[in-house]
């Protein structure tokens, strides 16, 4: 079966593993998934990201992060721009998630970046997801 939205699948796997309090998860690799995983690592939402080359597509292993008392670091993930309804924003309309407590991930002409970086560079793009 052909997967119509691999980014939504990636985000759903993270959400499900987080809710089940798994230590890590594996997903088939792609450039955009790799970029999203790196952003999650840099912003402190996941502990580590590992790339496994299997002479095919490759695999991304994401190690989830939990706080004291085993509380979840990721409270929520929402896919915004979907294949059936794309969501684009101009540079002056880049959204803030929960007044800056979360992040928006955007696909821009400069690559996949966070909402903070997009505002600093004054560029808009496609809003991929909100994470808080």
Curated annotation (Swiss-Prot):
GO molecular function, one term: rRNA binding
Pfam families: Ribosomal_S8
GN (gene name): rpsH
GO biological process: translation
The protein, known as: Small ribosomal subunit protein uS8
GO CC field: ribonucleoprotein complex; ribosome
Family recorded in the similarity comment: Belongs to the universal ribosomal protein uS8 family.
Superkingdom field: Bacteria
InterPro entries according to UniProt: Ribosomal_uS8, Ribosomal_uS8_CS, Ribosomal_uS8_sf
Function (record text): One of the primary rRNA binding proteins, it binds directly to 16S rRNA central domain where it helps coordinate assembly of the platform of the 30S subunit.
Source organism: Ligilactobacillus salivarius (strain UCC118) (Lactobacillus salivarius)
Alphabetized UniProt keyword annotations: Ribonucleoprotein, Ribosomal protein, RNA-binding, rRNA-binding
Quaternary context: Part of the 30S ribosomal subunit. Contacts proteins S5 and S12.
Keyword Transferase part of the UniProt annotation: no
């Amino acid at each position: 079966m052909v997967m119509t939205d691999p980014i939504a699948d990636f985000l759903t796997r993270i959400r499900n593993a987080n809710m089940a309090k798994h230590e890590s998860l594996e997903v088939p690799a792609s450039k955009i998934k790799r970029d999203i995983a790196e952003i999650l690592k840099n912003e402190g939402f996941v502990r580590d990201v590992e790339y496994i080359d299997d002479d095919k597509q490759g695999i991304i292993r994401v190690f989830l992060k939990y706080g004291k008392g085993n509380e979840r670091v990721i409270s929520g993930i929402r896919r915004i721009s979907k294949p059936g309804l794309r969501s684009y924003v101009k540079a002056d309309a880049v959204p803030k998630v929960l007044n800056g407590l979360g992040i928006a991930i955007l696909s821009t002409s400069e690559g996949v970046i966070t909402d903070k970086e997009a505002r600093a560079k004054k560029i808009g793009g496609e809003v991929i997801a909100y994470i808080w």
